[in-house]
Amino acid sequence: MADGGASSFIMLVTALLISGSVSTILISEWNKVARAAESDERKSAGSLGVSVDFAGDPMMVGFEDPAVGDDELTVYVLNSGIHEMSTTFELLINGVAPGTMTTSIAPSGTDWLPGYLLEITASDSSLSYTDGDDASLFFVGISESVQGYQHSATMNKEVRLNEI
């Protein structure tokens, strides 16, 4: 009878040691999961304040006819978010990237802050539009670093071209 009690005690101590080791591993892994979830939450919270919108009348987008002069299309994009946007972007006109693009920011001229406009003048010899043509614009831009992350913002707009 004495042997049964000692072996039961040894089994109890062994089970407690094993369960203690397992719980330590589980707590460590749970801590890693919690940190990853916190990082993802912080990253996604910053993306909520990043957005851009078309500025102006989509039925009156100015362009210059190549037959008359330079083939330029001028588009205004508003930083409608709460974070500063980078001037790194891509603009597609009917799915094609223009050969040359120049930009300016109003009113600052340098930083694309919330509420500021990015003026994009796109030109390409392959742009052959006439007054009243419709064009599909797609814009994607990135934010400056927000809590250590950069976020993208997109704009898709159907516009009507108006010869200047």
Where do the model's predicted regions map?
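C-terminal juxtamembrane segment of a hydrophobic transmembrane alpha-helix
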Residues: F9-E38
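N-terminal export/assembly leader peptides and their processing motifs that target proteins to secretory
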Residues: S28-I164
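Membrane-helix interfacial "entry" motifs
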Residues: M1-G4, S8
